[in-house]
Amino acid sequence: PLVSIFRSTPLSRPISLKVMEVHPLGSQAFVPLSGRPYLVVVARPGEFCADNLRVFLAGPQQGVNYHKGCWHHYSLALDEESDFLVIDRDGPGNNCLEVFLDEEIVIDY
């Protein structure tokens, strides 16, 4: 596996999502290191459809493992920069596909 540290910088509110990503060959895990809650944005596997989008508030001790094929946004810090331990698949093939959205998706919380 690939192991890295990802730093998420908070976006201004409301958050405008412009891109989603999917890992077709393996899962991807995010483990929070900064002790802060963060947003998780996901959509069902298959062709991306904004109607399937779901947003969750993850607690400061709660990691997330995105299943192979699950559309998701990068981990979203809320009020302060937050670091995450990221575990990703290693090996041949492109395991990260992005879709740029025709219309921005706005998350106001």
Where are these regions (language model features)?
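Residue-level detector of short, conserved catalytic/binding motifs and their immediate flanks
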Residues: Q28, V64, S82
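Conserved metal-binding segment of the jelly-roll/cupin
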Residues: L57-W71
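Ligand-binding loop in jelly-roll beta-barrel domains
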Residues: G69-L85
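Non-catalytic, conserved peripheral segments adjacent to functional cores
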Residues: P1-V55, D79, I87-D88, P92-F100, ...
